[in-house]
A protein has these predicted regions:
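Surface-exposed molecular-recognition determinants
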Residues: 2-647
């Protein structure tokens, strides 16, 4: 962010104002749901009633229902379809209400058929993000239409609403022509539709597709943030980018957005190819390079449902092309895109970002009040068995926490649920999942590929310095490398898949794995940066009242561990560091009680041990009970321990 902007924000803060801006979660949502042939309320946190916006819906599992658009300027009863040039039509059974936290649906199969699955994307009107304008054409050249973005648009989409005509798209990267959203055609080099755009207006030509005298139009105006975004906790984040790249089938393009995206639209401006929608809720992955289709795309110019695609990887700073594909990366062709940042909201309660559940009937298999980004699963706590680790970025791939094995596949590890994760078998109370949602200052997930350089910087989006980092090679054998912060300048290093001690003098564990941590990157080398290998890293931080990474020295007597919580810890991970000791997991679903507490070990396949009273509830955190025959693990006098706790 520019120095002048920082100074202005600081001045506003000192004067009693706030430097914070709107979070992504307040202005954009991808929300998936299953229809019910009746009425349905979609609660996605977007204030459409008070602020206005656009709702875009598509059936995912069929090709009979089109992309349909509704906005607060035209009203709930007016439907437009992007794969057709048709005029809007009136219906009272599709979107029936715009609410302060989402929208309501009627019984139409176009938006709510039972048991069809649907995707919805909601764009709230907000400066420097999105605006919606309706206007009546006058047929005059250089007609200007006002908008309220407060910045120059990145993309403008115009549709005549009272008669049939093509959807017209103007994009800042190809400003001398237009594209049509309802067809595959490449750029048409004519300026008679939309001629230009600035921070207050866009200018029309004389074409009837955008400016026929007496005709009615709607324009969806999307911003492009270029270091001038005013979003996120500090009011300085860019959240939407409209840009372009040139296809290269041998040296694949890497697009640096300055943020990790959750939504991406791509279109070839050179040749006749489909428009593509991909998002992380429907399975856009970090290594979608399988020609059989690793992730799902929807195509606004067709009525087709989710189709397999490949060749676009998410990165922590943008996206990269990984294959030669005519619709994404054909040699020399120009491709335009619009990308929207993943969430920026700092959680206010631990229940927003962490939960524990046993496997239940119905879908998803593990329920949570949020869309899960990372899960640990223990399949059978009462018998010996493995703990599985999976995450949204790598899809159905999983790793065992107790071994060095490469990742494998479980088709039941799916993530397209708003309230949990997995389609993984029948109800079983001995199968348990610990579930995390990514959020700034709390938890982040980073997938990266090695390049063999020492002290290689890997960007993360935790926004604070991580206090616990766990990284594993994915594509072949490799240890789970751990670094845990003990003091401001000292980390302990070790292995999650081992009971061995953690080294407390250097980060240079197992081949100089880690070398530095900051609020936006960590440095790796050696075993965590082999050329051509793929890795997954989990980053954890202490967040007041929500999570705590800490340490304690045991003295054998009962000890209260103050984490700054108010209702006790629901999850605790503990490891002795000065000598051998297992990675123990306790949680309130299995029991943190004034009595025996079941212990599971991430570094082994042992059945849970419920023969000892190791921990008692404590409102500010947890209590380590006195050492003895009933508590032999977590309080050995003189022992040094690290822990990670969640309220």
């Amino acid at each position: 962010m520019a120095t002048k902007k920082k100074m202005l924000q600081a001045a506003a803060g000192n004067a009693g104002g706030g430097a914070g801006g709107l979070d992504v979660e307040s202005v954009f949502s991808t929300y998936l749901y299953t229809g019910n042939d009746a009425s349905k309320t979609i609660t996605n946190g977007i204030d459409l009633d008070g602020e206005g916006g656009l709702v875009w819906i598509k059936q995912r599992d069929g090709s009979t229902q089109r992309h349909v658009l509704y906005d607060t300027e035209r009203g709930t009863s007016k439907t437009l379809s992007t794969d057709r040039a048709d005029a809007e039509f009136t219906s009272t059974t599709r979107v029936t209400s715009f609410n302060s936290d989402g929208f309501d649906l009627g019984s139409s199969s176009q938006v709510n058929g039972d048991p069809s699955n649907y995707a919805s994307w909601t764009f709230r009107k907000a400066p420097k993000f999105c605006d919606i304008v309706t206007y009546t054409g006058d047929g005059n050249d250089n007609r200007t239409v006002n908008h309220n973005l407060g910045s120059s648009p990145g993309m403008v989409i115009v549709k005549k609403t009272d008669a049939a005509d093509s959807w017209i798209v103007w994009h800042r990267s190809v400003p001398t022509g237009y594209l049509s959203l309802n067809v595959t055609s490449g750029l048409q080099n004519y300026t008679s539709r939309i001629k230009s755009a600035n921070d207050t207006t866009f200018t029309l030509g004389t074409s009837g597709q955008t400016n026929s005298s007496g005709a009615n139009y709607v324009a969806y105006v999307f911003a492009h943030n270029d270091g001038d975004g005013e979003f996120g906790p500090d009011g300085d984040a860019d959240i939407i980018k409209c840009g372009s790249y040139t296809g290269n089938e041998s040296s694949f393009p890497i697009i640096d957005l300055g943020f990790e995206p959750q939504f991406l639209m791509i279109k070839s401006a050179t040749s006749a190819e489909d428009w593509l929608f991909m998002d992380t809720m429907r399975g856009w992955l970090t290594d979608g390079n399988n020609p059989n289709g690793d992730f799902k795309v929807l195509r606004p110019n067709t009525a087709n449902g989710d189709g397999g695609s490949f060749g676009v990887n998410i990165t922590s700073t943008g996206f990269e092309l990984t294959s030669a594909s005519a619709d994404k990366n054909s040699n020399g062709n120009t491709f335009i895109y619009m990308a929207i940042r993943r969430g920026t909201k700092v959680p206010e309660s631990a229940t927003e970002v962490f939960d524990v559940d046993t496997r239940t009937s119905g879908l998803p298999s593990f329920k949570a009040p949020f869309a899960v980004d990372m899960g640990l699963v223990r399949k059978g706590t009462n018998t010996s068995g493995a703990t599985y680790n999976a995450n949204r970025l790598t899809g159905t791939k999983f790793l065992y926490t107790y071994t060095t094995d490469a990742e494998a596949n479980d088709s039941g590890f799916v993530w397209d649920f708003m309230d949990g994760w997995a389609n993984d078998g029948v109800a079983n109370s001995t199968v348990i999942s610990w579930m995390w949602k990514r959020a700034p200052k709390y938890f982040d997930v980073v997938a990266y590929s090695g390049d063999s350089y020492s002290n290689r910087d890997v960007t993360h989006n935790l926004t604070v310095k991580p206090e616990l980092v766990i990284t594993k090679k994915r594509n072949s054998s490799g240890n789970w490398e751990v670094a845990a912060k003990i003091t401001n300048t000292n980390y302990h290093g070790g292995l999650l898949n081992s009971s061995g001690s953690l080294v407390n003098t250097s980060l240079n564990v197992s081949g100089n794995a880690y070398s530095q941590f900051s609020d936006n990157h960590f440095q790796v080398g050696g075993t965590l940066n082999s050329s051509g290998d793929t890795y997954i890293a989990y980053l954890f931080a202490s967040l007041d009242g929500i999570s705590k990474v800490g340490s304690y020295t045991a003295d054998g007597s009962a000890q209260n561990i103050d984490c700054g919580f108010t209702s006790g810890a629901r999850f605790v991970l503990i490891k002795r560091t000065d000598t051998g000791g297992n990675w123990f997991v306790l949680d309130t679903v299995r029991g943190i009680v004034s009595g025996n507490d079941p212990l599971l070990e991430l570094n082994s396949t042992s059945a849970e041990d419920n023969g000892y009273d190791n921990m008692d509830p404590y409102s500010a955190g947890f209590t380590i009970t006195a050492y003895g025959g009933t508590s032999p693990y977590l309080n050995i006098s003189g022992g040094e321990y690290i822990f990670y706790a969640i309220a």
